[in-house]
From Swiss-Prot:
Name of this chain's protein: Replicase large subunit
(+)RNA virus helicase ATP-binding domain boundaries: 831-991
Other observations noted: Readthrough of the terminator codon UAG occurs between codons for Lys-1144 and Gln-1146.
Family label: Belongs to the tobamovirus RNA-directed RNA polymerase family.
PROSITE patterns: ALPHAVIRUS_MT (PS51743), PSRV_HELICASE (PS51657), RDRP_SSRNA_POS (PS50507)
């Protein structure tokens, strides 16, 4: 046996050493067989004949480039550019190999003869004739077909075509247009009609398709994948005039935006394309098709100077997990956000292999430099070559650093390299003809740097030009042949700046890679250019501040800023100096006395002295007494005025004996500005204004304000009011209403122009992004930077080429694009207010209308909904002599339709049935006997009076409903006084019988109206409510909605329209109309101020139907409550047509008041089931929710999201490693079942859902707000409310006087880590302030409601800056916050930051339960993402007033205007604007500032007892009986907040109950929140459990005092009526929290 084993081992050794012949033969046989199989496979490749004559080198090049084909080089044709011509056949066949056989295919600009010869009967070629060469090419195609046909005819009869060609030629014979057409691909009308996805190929034709048309054109043809081949040279991206394609002997030549492609051996083949279009195609990744589909470019391969790529259609709605088919897509078009280019160096190297391991250097031609005429270009040079030269010559001393030595060294290393004493060929392939220019350029770079260091080290004080001269002399000594022209040559390099009093050397970056250059060239946002003018901007800001200060302090002075600056420039005088001189004249500090002005007040004297024209003045017009009360006096003279004011009023308006209303909006009234320059029309011609006019326009002597004169008019010449200007209106009440309406139009136009100026002067770098209702159009690029919701606007504000803003009227071409003036326009801005000319045109007409009382007898017909007001108008009106006016076009059209149908003739026309705007703007000569106004209470009272005066009528009938929606003032910084909102009528008629409303709705009407309401409708029950689980269910395919669709908000309306519903309107738009069936839809779950029992919007919504109304809602609210109430009413009661709902009374029981703060220990009793029972009472159903695997379900199911433009990395969709790691953790199972969820795993879906919830789909509720002026007013009110004036002034003086000391204060208290971050920071450049990282909190927030049962809670997001940014700004804002908190009136206001719960309890202990107060709580939903540029302007104004440095303020604002969110973990990138960032250093204190400013602007905090603020929480104690404004409307229209004001019996603040007793208060944490946390599913061990118990015990320590549990019961009942008593629950909670062993029993370890 041993012998056998030995023999076996010997044989193995022999085989291993090759001595065994049998094994060697077997191995040779194996190699032979593999070679045979390989050749057999190669023989199966498609066979191609390369007929052109090419060289042996080219033969190898073609064979290696296309291994997919078996190529036979027949060499039967000799032609020019034979290599390129032969390659076109291979390129087309390579792309057709990618197309599935038989799949319909479009060949864009293709050779249809080649497809015919290949037998492809499924290809359509688009062969447009773009020039004469294309015509000639089509002639050759026809000849080729003729030759082929003749070849098969022959002399002896017809030979049949090959079988595979028969179908293709039969198709060409029967339908040539199916094979080829002469249209460009974008306009091709041919359709395969198969219903299948098509393909497309483009062989060197993609250049001629505009970049923006590629995606839509492919999608219109239902193309799934498009394969394209094209030539390109990276030299074109460097700005080179020539780009060579050496392999095929071709080149690109650049001529402006045209690039010419031609062959060096033959000049007739010459094609011209758009260079800009080629760059866009090369640089971009996404080609949008519509609002859903996008084509993604994927690079395939580069072969013989030809790039191949494919465009793959992607469905952005479906992600990559599922497949769906939609028959049609939305019509609105949007472009995806373009990502930064070439971030991946590997991808970059594949695209442009010649740029691999190379850097860009500036190249100077030595011959031009010697002549003084410098031309700078760029060149790609091997990086090692450049670094070797620079590293070597940098060691030369000054004597050795001459150009000859550098040239000699460069030549030596280029020509040879010595290795071990042997000279070999150089490894660097640098063109020899350019060595001179390369060496000179590198020499110049190093020489400039060394001489710069020398000049600084010498410390010689020389003029700036002397320094440059000195450097030129140094360079002359280093380069022979340089003469005096070297100085001019250095200046032309652009490296030196001698404009100021110093020499600045700006050297280019010598080590810039090709990808870095592309990023800077094509994606940079020009921050360097903006920073270069910072000093100019700062001086300009100072000038405008000084001008503004003079205007505010001294009325009557107007500045033409442009003329003022030109004047200062001409005299070479600092504008600030003249500003101080003017101020000194005003204040009489300059010692200058003007003759003849001694009797005038200082203000007026100074103004008259500075005026260049004559003025009319009245003596003794100085007013010194303050006017502090509102005075209403009818039919009295000006006796209440001072004599000066009375004379002035008489001069201005005559001795008017009518009624007069005087009101003020400010602290005191100063001298009104009564003087004006000649040739200036002042609008409004309304009240006596105490400051400068609101709206004025320079005019000629005989000109007036016309619409035609406004086109291209300077906005700066329309002097807009800055703040709410105090105005005194004179005349009768109707005259005052008319004057107020002109002011309203002026303020509306002023706010619109102000906001449009902000937009048009801002820097926007994106393309077709969305921001509220604004639109911004770049006239140079002919594209929208900000895409408006609707296009076709009537007018806009344009930034002209002279850097002025002007009003323009827009026109459009046939395609709907605006017709622009590229020469004079840079960009223009539009918004929702620029859709029509109504405001401008109304100002034009009404300015010329005399303001007198119309003297019309007005009868108000006040009727309930459906009482037949419109029918009564149609029945009573005399269509020959009377006029009907309506607020909207829909109502006017309805009246015309019904009247013509009733009389069976066109009695109602556009002349006697008109809207208010149309009637005022387009006056006609008709006079009317009577005017009938439908829904007349919806318009401004001044507009109604103007319309009645223009009509010339003697009597008017105003039909309306005082309980329905009134006129809404949408200009938030304009005051529409209460007394002017009242319509003055002579008679009132009432209608209380409704013919529309069913009986159940009539029962509701009786709770609204004081008189009994009856109905004639036979319908008994008509309303019902349906709760939907979420807004995503509201789609036509999922929820069928019958009847007219009505919404409460514009956002819900737009959401339903996007979902696919038609005929949707808001309640405001359909007031006064009637429908058989209606569907009222609420898709917004957050509180809406319009939805309340006494809201007029709810009344309108419930009374539009005659038969049925269904309310679809995502939450239960006041409407569902009303519907539930009317459904309970018995039918027998409804037959009475009138009913009243009894008032529900709550039995009150006096609390037991303890006269001292006692301590009563809790009795620690009970079992954990007590806590479970209490939780289920408060939040029924939450404990039955099985949500452990909701995250898994979401990943496995199809998801459809409504996204704003963003970039998604789909490879991060399934976070497999994190899932595996999470499953390996042993989570304890809680005994208590609450709404707490398991920790989520970050990934694309989770983070995307969180980002949609927290950052996207922002509310758009705000009206027209003058942001700049409104923010100034709010900030002033903020400081006057919370800070005493003397404290604020002391602080500002301290900040400005000792900024270094301020820096030392916060630096001394910083931790070592923060100081270390500052020490390691690279101060050469600024960090990216506008770039934020995004992450999520893994643990979902447990909410104290039942939403967990119907929705998948989104995680909380953290949007944060890098540490280096926080290290700079964190200490600064911390210092400013500390200073602010030290100034707050701590006796009345409490900012819950850096405080303890004990501090909160001590703050409220001043109030007892006996105090006469009411508790208000402002609840705001979507708080962070509702904040816009308005909120940011307020916050920045607060910081600046606290002393924030101007530079830091500018940087901070730049980092918050247009910000980039990047989530590297999930692979998401998107843009947001101004929105609150949840993780930057001002998140908490900034939110606190905003909520405090919001409350202070809406409530009289000067009368409050206490107020506390924390983040988005607020609690205010005010005296009872105060009247408040419409908080919901103000929060919506001004602050863009979905907010609601609650009156509470007990305060609830930051998760704590504020319980007041007889002698103070006690603060209890919310026990329900603590019990909810006991269901925590993220605990991983009992050590973790113990840490959790200690943290809860620290929070709940005040619950161990049971003395006031009876009051806590009442407080909990206020929020949770079904809670029952809470004492036993708190006893049980304290028992478990205080016992480690018992608390441990609340969690089970299933692994044991």
């Amino acid at each position: 046996m041993a012998n056998i084993n030995e023999q076996i081992n010997n044989q193995r050794d022999a085989a291993a050493s090759g001595r065994n012949n049998l094994v060697s033969q077997l191995a040779s046989k194996r190699v032979y067989d593999e070679a045979v199989r390989s050749l057999d496979h190669q023989d199966r490749r498609p066979k191609m004949n390369f007929s052109r004559v090419v060289s042996t080198e080219h033969t190898r090049l073609v064979t290696d480039a296309y291994p997919e084909f078996s190529i036979s080089f027949t060499a039967t044709k000799n032609s020019v550019h034979s290599l390129a011509g032969g390659l076109r056949l291979l390129e087309l066949e390579y792309m057709m190999m990618q197309v599935p056989y038989g799949s319909p295919c479009y060949d864009i600009g293709g050779n249809y003869t080649q497809h015919l010869f290949k037998g492809r009967s499924y290809v359509h070629c688009c062969n447009p004739c773009l020039d004469l060469k294309d015509v000639a090419r089509n002639v050759m195609y026809n000849d080729m077909i003729t030759q082929h046909v003749q070849r098969h005819k022959g002399s002896g009869g017809c030979r049949p075509l090959p079988t595979f060609q028969i179908d293709a030629f039969r198709r060409y014979d029967s339908s040539p247009c199916a094979v080829t057409c002469s249209d460009v691909f974008q306009e091709c009308s041919y359709d395969f009609g198969s219903g299948r996805d098509n393909h497309a190929v483009s062989l060197h034709s993609i250049y001629d398709i505009p970049y923006s048309s590629i995606g839509p054109a492919l999608h219109r043809k239902n193309v799934r994948v498009c394969y394209a081949a094209f030539h390109f040279s990276e030299a074109l991206l460097l700005g080179s005039p020539v780009g060579n394609l050496n392999s095929i002997g071709a080149q690109f030549r650049v001529d402006g935006d045209d690039v010419h492609f031609l062959f060096s051996e033959e000049s007739t083949l010459h094609y011209t394309h758009s260079l800009e279009n080629i760059k866009l195609i090369v640089m971009r990744t996404y080609f949008p098709a519509d609002d859903r589909f996008v084509y993604i470019k994927e690079f395939m391969v580069k072969r013989v100077d030809t790039f191949f790529f494919r465009l793959v259609r992607a469905d952005t709605h479906m992600l990559h997990k599922s497949v769906g088919h939609y028959s049609k897509s939305k019509s609105e078009y949007f472009a995806l956000n373009t990502p930064p280019i070439f971030q991946d160096k590997a991808t970059f190297s594949v695209w442009f292999p010649e740029a691999k391991r190379k850097v860009l250097i500036p190249k100077f031609e030595l011959s031009r430099f010697l002549s003084g005429n410098v031309k700078i270009s760029r060149m790609l040079v091997d990086a090692d070559f450049v670094h070797t030269i620079i590293n070597h010559i940098s060691t030369y001393d000054n004597k050795a650093l001459v150009w000859k030595n550098v040239q000699s060294f460069v030549e030596s290393i280029r020509s040879r390299v010595i290795v071990n004493g042997v000279s070999v060929k150089s490894e660097w392939n640098v063109p020899v003809d350019q060595l001179t220019d390369i060496s000179f350029s590198i020499f110049l770079l190093v020489k400039v740097r060394k001489v710069q260091i020398e000049l600084m080290s010498d410390k010689v004080v020389i003029e700036a030009r002397g320094l440059l001269r000195r450097f030129a002399d140094s360079l002359k000594s280093a380069v022979e042949g340089l003469g005096d022209c070297v100085y001019d040559a250095l200046v032309q390099t652009g490296w030196f700046d001698t404009s100021s009093d110093e020499l600045k050397v700006l050297l280019p970056e010598p080590f810039m890679t090709f990808s870095d250059y592309l990023e800077g060239m094509y994606e940079a946002d020009a921050k360097i250019e903006r920073e270069s003018v910072s000093e100019l901007l700062a001086s300009g800001d100072d000038l405008f501040k000084k001008i503004d200060e003079i205007r505010n302090n001294y009325s009557g002075v107007e500045f033409d800023v442009e003329k003022f600056q030109e004047f200062c420039k001409e005299l070479n005088v600092n504008p600030m100096l003249i500003g101080h001189v003017i101020e000194a004249i005003f204040s009489q500090k300059a010692g200058v006395t003007v003759t003849g002005l001694g009797t005038l007040s200082p203000e007026m004297g100074a103004s008259v002295a500075l005026s260049s024209t004559s003025v009319d003045t009245c003596e003794d017009m100085d007013v010194t007494e303050d006017m502090e009360d509102i005075v209403l006096m009818a039919d009295k003279s000006h006796s209440y005025m001072s004599p000066e004011m009375a004379r002035w009023a008489d001069v201005k308006y005559g001795n008017n004996k009518g009624a007069l209303v005087e009101y003020k909006v400010g602290t005191s009234m100063t001298l009104p500005a009564t003087w004006a320059e000649k040739g200036k029309a002042v609008l409004p011609l309304s009240g006596i204004c105490v400051r400068k006019p609101q709206f004025s326009k320079p005019l000629d002597e005989e000109d007036d304000l016309r619409l035609s004169n406004m086109n291209f008019f300077k906005v700066s010449d329309l002097k807009l009011k800055k703040t709410i200007t105090p105005v005194v209106y004179t005349g009768t009440i109707r005259e005052r209403q008319m004057k107020n309406y002109i002011d309203y139009l002026s303020a509306s136009l002023g706010s619109t122009l102000g906001n449009l100026e902000r937009i048009v002067r801002s820097d926007w770098n994106g393309t077709e992004e969305s921001m509220q209702t604004f639109g911004l159009y770049d006239c140079e690029k002919c594209k929208w930077l900000l895409l408006p919701a609707e296009k076709k606007h009537a007018w806009a504000v344009v930034l002209a080429s002279d850097d002025t803003t002007r009003i323009i009227f827009l026109s459009y071409d046939e395609s709907g694009s605006p017709i622009i003036d590229k020469k004079n326009w840079k960009r223009f801005a539009v918004c929702s207010e620029t859709k029509v000319y109504s405001v401008i045109r109304s100002l034009e007409v009404l300015n010329k209308e005399a303001i007198v009382d119309p003297g019309v007898h007005i009868t108000l017909v006040d009727g309930v909904p459906g009482c037949g007001k419109t029918a009564e108008i149609i029945a009573r009106v005399n269509w020959k002599t009377d006029l009907v006016l309506t607020p909207g076009r829909e109502a006017a059209a309805m009246i015309r339709r019904r009247a013509c149908a009733l009389h069976k003739s066109p009695v109602a026309t556009n002349d006697n049935v008109r809207t208010f705007d149309s009637f005022v703007m387009n006056r006609k000569i008709f006079k009317f006997d009577a005017v009938y106004v439908d829904e007349g209470l919806m318009v401004h009272t001044g507009l109604l009076n103007f319309a009645l005066k223009i009509s010339g009528c003697k009597k008017a009938f105003v039909f309306g409903d005082a309980k329905q929606i009134p006129f809404i003032n949408r200009v938030m910084n304009f005051d529409y006084p209460k007394e002017l909102r009242t319509l003055i009528v002579d008679n009132v008629e009432r209608r209380y019988v409704t013919h529309r409303c069913p009986r159940d709705v009539t029962s509701f009407l009786n709770t609204i109206y004081k008189a009994a309401v009856a109905t004639t409708s036979p319908v008994v029950h008509s309303v019902k409510a349906i709760k939907v689980s979420g807004a995503g269910i509201l789609r036509p395919e999922l929820t069928k909605i019958k009847g007219k669709i009505i919404t409460f908000t514009q956002s819900d309306k737009q959401s339903l329209i996007k979902s696919g519903y038609n005929d949707v309107n808001t309640v405001h738009e359909i007031q006064g109309e009637t429908f058989e069936e209606t569907a009222v839809v609420r898709a917004t779950p957050t509180p809406i101020g319009l939805i309340a029992r006494d809201s007029p919007h709810v009344l309108v919504a419930l009374t539009r139907h005659t038969k049925a109304m269904v309310y679809y809602t995502v939450v239960f609210d006041a409407v569902t409550s009303i519907i539930a109430d009317v459904e309970k009413v018995d039918q027998s009661i409804l037959t009475m047509f009138a009913t009243t709902v009894p008032t529900k009374x709550q039995l009150m029981q006096n609390s037991l008041y303890v006269h001292r703060n006692i301590f009563l220990p809790v009795s620690k009793t009970g079992f954990y089931t007590d806590m479970q029972e209490f939780y289920d009472r408060c939040l029924p159903g939450n404990s039955f929710v099985l949500n452990d695997f909701d995250a898994v379900t979401m990943r496995l199911r199809d998801n459809e999201f409504n996204l704003q433009p963003c970039r998604l990395t789909l490879s991060n969709l399934d976070p497999v490693p994190a899932l595996i790691k999470n499953e390996a953790q042993n989570f304890l199972i809680p005994v208590l079942r609450t709404a707490c969820e398991r920790p989520r795993i970050p990934g694309l879906l989770e983070n995307l859902v969180a980002m949609i919830k927290r950052n996207m789909n922002t509310p758009d509720l705000a009206g027209t707000v003058d942001i700049t002026n409104m923010s100034i007013s709010i900030v002033d009110n903020f400081f006057s409310s919370f800070v005493r004036d003397e404290v604020l002034l002391d602080h500002l003086d301290c900040v400005r006087a000792s900024s270094i000391q301020s820096f030392s204060d916060w630096f001394s208290c910083q931790p070592t880590s923060a100081v270390g971050q500052l020490a390691n920071f690279n101060f050469i450049d600024l960090p990216a302030f506008d770039t934020y990282m995004h992450m999520i909190k893994r643990q979902p927030k447990s909410r104290l409601d039942t939403s967990i049962q119907s929705e998948y809670p989104a995680l909380q997001t953290i949007v944060y800056h890098p540490k280096v940014v926080n290290a700079v700004f964190g200490p600064v804002f911390k210092y400013l916050t500390t200073k602010f908190l030290s100034m707050v009136d701590s006796s009345k206001f409490f900012f819950y930051t850096r405080k303890k719960p004990e501090d909160l309890q001590e703050f409220f202990s001043d109030l007892s339960s006996h105090s006469d107060y009411e508790i208000l709580e402002l609840d705001v939903s979507k708080y962070d993402k509702s904040q816009s540029d308005f909120h940011f302007s307020i916050e920045m104004a607060i910081w600046e007033k606290l002393g924030l440095d101007d530079i830091l303020a500018w940087m901070w604002s730049m980092g918050h205007k247009r910000t980039i969110l990047q989530d590297f973990q999930a692979g998401i990138k998107t843009l947001i604007y101004y929105q609150r960032k949840s993780g930057d250093v001002t998140t908490f204190i900034g939110n606190t500032f905003i909520i405090a400013a919001c409350v202070a602007s809406m409530l009289p905090l000067d009368k409050c007892f206490k107020a506390s603020f924390c983040g988005d929480d607020s609690l205010i104690y005010l005296p009872k009986g105060l009247e408040y404004p419409d908080i919901q409307a103000t929060a919506n229209l001004v602050w863009n907040f979905e907010a609601k004001l609650f009156r509470k019996k007990y305060g609830y603040f930051c998760g704590k109950y504020i319980i007041h007793h007889a002698n103070g208060c006690i603060v209890y944490p919310d026990p329900l929140k603590l019990i909810s946390k006991l269901g925590n599913k993220s605990l991983v061990g009992y050590e973790h459990v113990e840490e959790f118990r200690i943290s809860l015990l620290d929070v709940a320590h005040s619950l161990f005092n049971g003395a006031y549990f009876h009051l806590l019961d009442d407080a909990i009942h206020e929020l949770f009526p079904n809670a029952g008593g809470c004492s036993f629950v708190i006893n049980c909670l304290c028992k478990y929290l205080s016992d480690k062993r018992l608390f441990r029993s609340l969690y089970i370890d299933v692994s044991k």
